[in-house]
């Protein structure tokens, strides 16, 4: 029998797989998913709904995320440590870096998405302790 947390990790992997193919991941997201921007974001706070993800795509038309690790962080949470590349849609200035994400999954759908600017910050927010985090 596959554990719920393993199923959650697989669901989050399917989201990134869909995005990697430039396909929709809507089927994996709850209609009212919470998209949580950190306090230091240009627009901090919580957005609701699947369309929240479109804002990033519209701001950074070529925003690409390359997950490097998926971690089971409890009964509902999945941590994704990733690297990203993008360029501003208006300026064309290239941007690269690392991000971390915490996805909360319930009932076979992602219900909450939080992002962080570093792997270390993500691991701390998830309550995971790793000495090798960057």
Stretches found by the model and what they are:
Residues 22, 26-76:
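A solvent-exposed, acidic/Ser-Thr-rich amphipathic alpha-helical stretch
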Residues 2-31:
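Short acidic-aromatic low-complexity motifs
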Residues 1-13, 55-134:
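A beta-strand edge to alpha-helix "cap/lid" segment located at domain peripheries
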């Amino acid at each position: 029998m596959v554990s719920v947390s393993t199923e959650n990790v697989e669901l989050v992997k399917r989201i990134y797989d869909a995005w990697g193919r430039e396909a929709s991941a809507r089927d994996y997201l709850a209609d009212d998913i919470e998209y949580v921007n950190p306090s230091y974001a240009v627009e901090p706070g919580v957005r609701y709904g699947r369309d929240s993800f479109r804002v990033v795509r519209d701001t950074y038309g070529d925003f690409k995320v390359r997950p490097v690790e998926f971690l089971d962080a409890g009964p509902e949470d999945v941590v994704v440590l990733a690297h990203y590349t993008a360029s501003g849609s208006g300026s064309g200035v290239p941007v690269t870096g690392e991000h971390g994400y915490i996805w909360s999954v319930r009932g076979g759908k992602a219900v909450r998405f939080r992002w962080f600017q570093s792997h270390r910050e993500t691991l701390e927010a998830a309550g995971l302790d790793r000495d090798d985090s960057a």
